[in-house]
Structures are given as structure tokens and as C-alpha cells.
Amino acid sequence: MNLVAYSTPKPVLQKLISRFGHLPAGQGVSFSQSYGPSGSQARAVVAGQPADVVFLSTGLDIDSLVDAGLVPKRWTKAPYGGIAADSVVAFVVRPGNPKHIHGWKDLLKPGVKVVTPNPFSSGSAKWNVLAAYGAMRKSGANDHKAVQLVTKLFQHVVSQDPSGSTAANTFFSGQGDVLITYESEAYAAFAAGKQGKLVVPKPTMLIQLPMVALKNAPGAAKAFIKYAHAPKQQRIFAATGYRPVVKSVLKRPDLAGWRKKYDTGPAFKIQDRLFGGWLKANRVWFDPNEGRMVGIERSVGGPTH
């Protein structure tokens, strides 16, 4: 079975795959795994890369597979809306938080150097951009002012890698003062021994991570997705830094520490009126010809593809 995923969840997916092989539905099933920037992965599948299950970082990337006739149009009608796990947009700062970064406006302070991926290749980066804009709007800025503040934020960006994982590698190699990333990416880095401090800004954005089977995938693909939503596997997500979509698993005593970590207050969503869903948000912000990020990137000399 061919599993194509964005770069960040490789450790948790390998745990799920290992356990799946011990179940009746997984016996005799071997996996070919591919990891990379979410947008690049989606484009590769459209271009013919073999895929049975995709786990990508935005619904927008799944919709591109729908447009190519590879995924059912009603994929969001699946249990949990087709989402396998959640996260939120968060910051990682240096140990001790020497720049005193606690919220979005702190990223705009003189001398603060920010690391975030390139939104024209990385789904993580798209979440980061929309989270920054949404936070400014939620804090009282009108649309024009919020766009100005996002532009100012990108004047502080010192590195735009192609994916969330490579951006994290850049930060942990010593570049920048703050990394904008998935909360789950931060926990994965800490588990691997990287040094830093997690800051979940208020407000922030809920990241919804879709996992779907392609139209012509074998039955084992749907079985794997069902398995990924079962409580035991959702506990694996929860204990690996992802917010489970099966919320009841957080009631378990062994996950009490994670439950406390995930209790960071409400988060706004891509479906909110402020964004109007992925299709509208992508058109407004990331269209390669007219999107707001094209102008912002050009103004700071950043990449636009």
C-alpha cells in the first residue's frame, strides 16, 4: 500500500504502520512511504506518483486531488470530516525565551528573527500565514491593517524552507529567534532531544490534518484509515504531540499531562467566516498570480513558487 504524507508526521505514522501489521486487516500488507512538503506531495500524486492513502496538511491539498478525479468529492463526509488529527499554530523559542516572545505582536519587535516555511510549497506555512492574519483580526485590526502586519512579520523572516520539517531543522541548527510551526512538530523535536520552549499564542489557529483513501485504493487503505481513528491509535497521536479528533481518549489518566498541555483555550478555524474555507483563503492569499502572499514575498525578496 502506498502512503503519501506531508513531512512532519513520519514518526507517528511509522508507529501506526507497525501496529497495523499485527491486525487481521493489516496482515500481509506492506507499505511504501513517501514524505515531503504537503503541496509538493499533492502535486506529485496528481502527476502520477502511486498513492492509496494520503495524509496531508491542508484540505486544500486534498481538494487538488478531488479536482484531478483521484479522491471522492464528498471526502469531508467521512467520519470526523476526513480529519485524522489536529494541531495548532505555535512558536518555538530559544531556551529561557530571551526575546520574551509570548504573542503574535512580539514577533514584530525590533531585532526578532523569524523562521517559517515557504507558503508556496508548504502547507504548514499556509497555516502560519492565516494564523498570523487571523490573530491580528481577532485582536481588533481591520483587514487592511492585518495585511500590513503580516507584511511586517515577513520583514522579520530570515529563512523560508520548503517544508515544516526543514524549517524546524534550520531553527534547531541555530538560525533565528523563533520558529512558527505546528505544535506537534515542536513536541516531536523536543522528543528527539532538541532544545527550546513551546509558546502557544492566544489566539491561535486550529490545524486540521486530513487522511483519505484514493478512489481506486485497495480495501486495506480504508481499513487503515478506520484503524487510525480507533481510540488506541488516537492515543498514539495524543501522546506524540497531536490533538486527537476522538476527544474522549484525553480522559485517560495516562494522558492527563497531555490533556493539560492541549488546554490552551479556543482556536479559530479555516471554516470561520473570517477565512471562508480553504478555496477562498487560497485564492485570496496564495494564488500564484494575484494572491496577497505574492506581493508580500516580492516586497521582502522572498520565494513565490
Indicate where each model-derived feature is located.
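N-terminal segment of the mature folded domain
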Residues: 1-121, 255
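Short helix-loop capping/hinge motifs at secondary-structure junctions, enriched
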Residues: 96-102, 121, 134-142, 216-221
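Periplasmic-binding protein-like
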Residues: 83-88, 150-154, 161-162, 191-222, ...
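Ligand-binding pocket segment of bilobal, Venus flytrap-like solute-binding proteins
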Residues: 138-203, 210
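Bilobed "Venus flytrap"/periplasmic-binding protein-like clamshell domains
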Residues: 8-14, 119-144
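Alpha-helix capping/helix-boundary segments
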Residues: 9, 60-61, 167, 184-186, ...
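Short secondary-structure boundary segments
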Residues: 58, 118, 183-184, 240
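Extracellular/periplasmic juxtamembrane helices and adjacent flexible linkers that interface
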Residues: 218-305
